[in-house]
């Protein structure tokens, strides 16, 4: 069961009447995320044709472009464009992908119907190969938008990251 499936199950449990029409999936491993980034993610649903919105920031370091642990969002952002439809998610861009590259930040805003549909779908072939569950949505014609943000939150995945996050949060308070 992927995180989207768990979010959908929790929403059904907490809101069986369907009162809430949108939901944000913000995971606890991003404690330093800028609240404005969350607002921008939600704003990605302003266009009625968008089913799911997420956020990305421009990749500056060449080592991040080649790092398969940094998921890249393939979308025509930049040149004054703040929101775009997502074409693909990749771990290692190929020659068919043009720079600049955008680092995906694992925050999502869903329309409830889209989340329910997404959670009911089987794992897609590309999702299984690339180990990127967001490809299940793209492979099943759910429209995803990405909103550009300027800051990259610290992702906490090791004890050293936790200490760095604590230091950052102390400085803010």
Predicted regions and their residues:
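Alpha-helical elements of Rossmann-like donor-binding domains used by nucleotide-donor carbohydrate transfer enzymes
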Residues: 6-9, 37-40, 164
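Glycine-rich phosphate-binding loop signature in dinucleotide/nucleotide-binding domains
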Residues: 11-21, 45-48
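Short beta-strand-to-loop acidic/aromatic patch adjacent to the donor-nucleotide binding site
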Residues: 17-31
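Structured catalytic cores of enzymes that bind and process phosphorylated ligands/cofactors
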Residues: 23, 38-42, 48-55, 140, ...
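Conserved alpha/beta core of the MobA/IspD/sugar-nucleotide pyrophosphorylase nucleotidyltransferase superfamily
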Residues: 99-173
